[in-house]
Each structure stands twice: as structure tokens, then as C-alpha cells.
């Protein structure tokens, strides 16, 4: 069964490079493996997809996603949204302002005069609670508190990643709230058509 205790994997990523304690919460690297032996590597920091190891058109196993080599790289800020979860709101909100049920709200500003991808500290920069559900599935969970980045309502979010035997990576989102709010969740996965070894351009 695939789990975080494995030291050998197709992508060559080292689990210890993804382990840290951030605001009292531990980060780690999770390996999903399907019955064909191919793999997906995911960090619970930002739900970052760090590797997807599948065959290319010539049958050569390659990492087809632009990922990260370590928690340090994930937190560097150079590419904060690269292959991570995005929320509470994917894309820009002009001037960080929206109106809901006749009430105006002001969100955090982090992209010129606008609000981008959930604010200055969006879901991409949060440590999620992780639960591996067998070798091919991972659930990430967190609660976004009332007022986080200016949003109204508490938002309870679960994101499930499932790696099928057809080499499909399925991402499902479930969010519930205790108050009317806005939400637009997505994953900012960046794919490459050519092979990329983790950490180096080919």
C-alpha cells in the first residue's frame, strides 16, 4: 500500500524534503499509486501536486506536471500558485469588493488593486489535514474561519484526489458553510507536454 513512509518512488522525491512544522501543523509528502504502478505525489502544504509519473507517447515514464522539489521551494514565493489548490476564490475580484444580499464586503488586496486567488494567504499557503484512503486516494481538509482574507462565513472544505488505473487524476471538492458566502475552488495544476525531471528542465 502506498504511503508516506516509502522512501523509494518513481518521481525520486524525498519525503524528508517535504517535512516541516508550520504554525504547529506538520507537512508531508503523500504518494498515490495505481495498479499499473504509476504515481502521483502530493504535499499537504497547499495541496500541491509535486509529480505525476505516467508514460509518455513513447511509453517512457515521465513527470508530466510542473511541481516542486521540497517544502522550501513551495514556500519560496517565486511561484506561489504553481500546481496548488486555489481558494476561497480562484481568479481576480476587482478591487477585492463584492456584494452579497445587499451587504458590501472588502477582501484582502494582493494583486495591484485587486484580490487574487483567495488573498495574501490563500489555500495555496495553508497546511491541510491529510488522510490517505488506500493506495490511490488522498483527502485534504481544512476549515477557513470567518473573516479569513475578508470572507464572510466559516467554510469547511474537503478535497479528494483519486488516481485511477486509467492514469486519471480526479479532484473533487466539497465545501459547506454556516453563512451565505462566495466560493470558487480550483487547482492550479500546470502540465507539460514534454518530459520534466523533478527540479531540472530537460
Residue ranges and their predicted role:
Residues 2-200:
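Surface-exposed acidic/polar loop and edge beta-strand patches at domain peripheries
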Amino acid at each position: 500500500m502506498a504511503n508516506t513512509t516509502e522512501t523509494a518512488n518513481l518521481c525520486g522525491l524525498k519525503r524528508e524534503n517535504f517535512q516541516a512544522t508550520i504554525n504547529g501543523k506538520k507537512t508531508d509528502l503523500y504518494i498515490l499509486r495505481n495498479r499499473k504502478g504509476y504515481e502521483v505525489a502530493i504535499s499537504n502544504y497547499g495541496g500541491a501536486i509535486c509529480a505525476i509519473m505516467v508514460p509518455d507517447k513513447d511509453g517512457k515514464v515521465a513527470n508530466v506536471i510542473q511541481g516542486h522539489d521540497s517544502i522550501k521551494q513551495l514556500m519560496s514565493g517565486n511561484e506561489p500558485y504553481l500546481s496548488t489548490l486555489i481558494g476561497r476564490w480562484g481568479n481576480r475580484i476587482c478591487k477585492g469588493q463584492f456584494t452579497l444580499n445587499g451587504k458590501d464586503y472588502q477582501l484582502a488586496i494582493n494583486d495591484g488593486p485587486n484580490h487574487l486567488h483567495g488573498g495574501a494567504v490563500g489555500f495555496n499557503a495553508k497546511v491541510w489535514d491529510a488522510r490517505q484512503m488506500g493506495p490511490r486516494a488522498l483527502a485534504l481538509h481544512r476549515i477557513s474561519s470567518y473573516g479569513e482574507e475578508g470572507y464572510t462565513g466559516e467554510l469547511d472544505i474537503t478535497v479528494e484526489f483519486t488516481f485511477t488505473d486509467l492514469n486519471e487524476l480526479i479532484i473533487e471538492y466539497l465545501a459547506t458553510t454556516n453563512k451565505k458566502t462566495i466560493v470558487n475552488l480550483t487547482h492550479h495544476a500546470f502540465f507539460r507536454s514534454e518530459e520534466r525531471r523533478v527540479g531540472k528542465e530537460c
